[in-house]
Amino acid sequence: KRFSDGAQYRFEVPGIQGPKVMSALLEEMDRYDINLHRVTQTKGIMLLTDNEIIEMVKLAKQGQTDLILAIGPRATTDTSASVHTEEGVRMGYRLRGQEQIVRAIEDVKRAVAFGCRSFLVYDEGCLWVLNEMKRAGELPVDIHFKVSAHAGHGNPCSARMLEIIGASSINPVRDIQLQMLASMRQAIDIPIDIHTENPKSTGGFIRHYEVPEMIRVAAPIYLKTGGSVAATHSWD
């Protein structure tokens, strides 16, 4: 399996939270003559001003890279106390209540109005309703939805379910093993996004030595890099 241009892999840099750092990143990519295919913001659209979104969309077009903006509403910024407990943390970033679904949709619609077409999704129900809106013509037909590693998926059955309800690519759990990755690839056709390195908050492990095998068993694959310099998922 391959990308539409025949490539087996592409590069993605996550955790690019605003236009200033995005501009610096793209300048370095040019300096080293490296093609960057994706830039992902993780803190949430709701934490960006209109002008910041406009500038990031502009930079993406100039740099010929895809910009992925994260849906802002999530359990950790909701009023729930449970997510901050040892047991409750297992709910991840999923949305609680229909009101949060509505807010997430409005977050996406705001960014769409400024030209963004790719979004990072944390909640399966939110993914489903956004895809239904796409099918109904309420969102652009060229919109893409990337499922975050924070959704906690790591098996072929879950991967297939996500593909069915609208995922354009899937980021499995960060410590997924090669044989697990291979089984996911057998179940789906959409790209898989894989962390080749990780922030300290999610283990800090570096998997560069596994990259050739990742490509062999899981292409088409987005190789995510740059995470080991960050302290946390939404680090500035």
Give, region by region, the residue ranges found by the protein language model.
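Active-site pocket-lining/capping segments in soluble small-molecule metabolic enzymes
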Residues: 1-116, 121-153, 171, 178-236
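Short, glycine/polar-rich helix-capping loops at beta-to-alpha or helix-loop-helix junctions
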Residues: 154-158
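Hydrophobic, aromatic-enriched interface-forming segments
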Residues: 165-168
